[in-house]
Amino acid sequence: MLQKTGRGLLAFLLIVLEWTQPSLPSPLRPICDLRVLNHFIKEAQDAEAAMKLCSEGCTLSDSVIVPQTTVEFDVWEKKSALAKAQEVQSGLWLLQEAFNFLRTSVTNTALHSHIDNSVRNLLSVNAVLRSLNIQEFTPPASAAEIEGTWRVSTATELLQVHINFLRGKVRLILLDAQACQQDVS
């Protein structure tokens, strides 16, 4: 009887230890899982590849304003969380506006699904930011009012900016988000 009780107690302790994992970091919240962002980056790369293969009906009719994608890490680290959030959200808004313009410029219907998917992914990133309690972005009256922008004149350039923005500033803001910090107890 004592042997059975000892085994049961040992099994119970193992379950409790496995459940609490006292020295292991807690798992990240699903919204912090960078595999989702990597999936969005992969889809953006697929869109860029499709755009490069396009020979007709796949051009921008005018240049569009896009966010700067370069990140000076020492400058980024010194920015407040609010400044980082505003920079990322304004960049996402600029990209959405640029993709909406691209959608009206591109006559090749095969590319419309890539463009629509890119817009959906940008909206998903915005939803993730909202779920991380990052303050909503209020777009200005004009894209020209946003600092840290430049113009691109081809669809391929737009898609490259999209990829780099996701890889850079979006990834950094997710890594910096308080809710995404691993809790090492």
Swiss-Prot record:
<dbReference type="GO" id="GO:0005128">
    <property type="term" value="F:erythropoietin receptor binding"/>
</dbReference>
<dbReference type="Pfam" id="PF00758">
    <property type="entry name" value="EPO_TPO"/>
</dbReference>
<dbReference type="GO" id="GO:0005179">
    <property type="term" value="F:hormone activity"/>
</dbReference>
<feature type="signal peptide">
    <location>
        <begin position="1"/>
        <end position="25"/>
    </location>
</feature>
<dbReference type="InterPro" id="IPR003013">
    <property type="entry name" value="Erythroptn"/>
</dbReference>
<comment type="similarity">
    <text>Belongs to the EPO/TPO family.</text>
</comment>
<keyword id="KW-0372">Hormone</keyword>
<dbReference type="GO" id="GO:0048823">
    <property type="term" value="P:nucleate erythrocyte development"/>
</dbReference>
<protein>
    <recommendedName>
        <fullName>Erythropoietin</fullName>
    </recommendedName>
</protein>
<comment type="function">
    <text>Erythropoietin is the principal hormone involved in the regulation of erythrocyte differentiation and the maintenance of a physiological level of circulating erythrocyte mass.</text>
</comment>
<dbReference type="GO" id="GO:0048471">
    <property type="term" value="C:perinuclear region of cytoplasm"/>
</dbReference>
<keyword id="KW-0265">Erythrocyte maturation</keyword>
<keyword id="KW-0732">Signal</keyword>
<dbReference type="GO" id="GO:0005615">
    <property type="term" value="C:extracellular space"/>
</dbReference>
<dbReference type="GO" id="GO:0043249">
    <property type="term" value="P:erythrocyte maturation"/>
</dbReference>
<dbReference type="GO" id="GO:0014823">
    <property type="term" value="P:response to activity"/>
</dbReference>
<feature type="disulfide bond">
    <location>
        <begin position="54"/>
        <end position="58"/>
    </location>
</feature>
<keyword id="KW-0964">Secreted</keyword>
<dbReference type="GO" id="GO:0048793">
    <property type="term" value="P:pronephros development"/>
</dbReference>
<keyword id="KW-1015">Disulfide bond</keyword>
<feature type="disulfide bond">
    <location>
        <begin position="32"/>
        <end position="180"/>
    </location>
</feature>
<dbReference type="GO" id="GO:0005125">
    <property type="term" value="F:cytokine activity"/>
</dbReference>
<dbReference type="InterPro" id="IPR009079">
    <property type="entry name" value="4_helix_cytokine-like_core"/>
</dbReference>
<dbReference type="InterPro" id="IPR001323">
    <property type="entry name" value="EPO_TPO"/>
</dbReference>
